[in-house]
């Protein structure tokens, strides 16, 4: 009956996928673009029947069932970035954390949270 997706990166990809499938008009009255929280919050309240967002946000949320990733071209990654505050009081520790986050050693930890590591 209804599909919810965010206004962020994953929601932009959903809207593009709907357009690529030529379903924009057909689904116009059935889609809800959320803001103000994860799609799963709205899904758990039954604001819509199907929710679409990044896997790491969808998994293990009470009141919802994670079904799986979208197929093929509909499953586009959302890029994440990291930065360092120039006035940081712990800049050495922050730089060490950033180096770890992009290291091969971090890959298994990231994958456990359904985040794909970068491919430098």
Regions from the PLM with identified roles:
Residues 1-120:
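Exported/periplasmic ABC-transporter solute-binding proteins
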């Amino acid at each position: 009956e209804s599909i919810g997706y965010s206004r962020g990166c994953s929601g932009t990809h959903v809207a593009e996928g709907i357009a690529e499938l030529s379903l924009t008009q057909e689904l116009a009255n059935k889609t809800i673009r959320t803001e103000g929280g994860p799609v799963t919050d709205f899904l758990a309240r039954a604001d819509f029947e199907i929710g679409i967002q990044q896997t790491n946000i969808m998994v293990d949320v009470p009141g919802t069932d994670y079904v799986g990733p979208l197929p093929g071209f509909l499953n586009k990654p959302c890029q994440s970035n990291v930065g360092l505050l120039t006035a940081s009081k712990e800049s050495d520790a922050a730089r060490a954390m950033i180096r770890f986050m992009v290291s091969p050693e971090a890959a298994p930890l990231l994958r456990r949270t359904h985040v794909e590591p970068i491919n430098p």
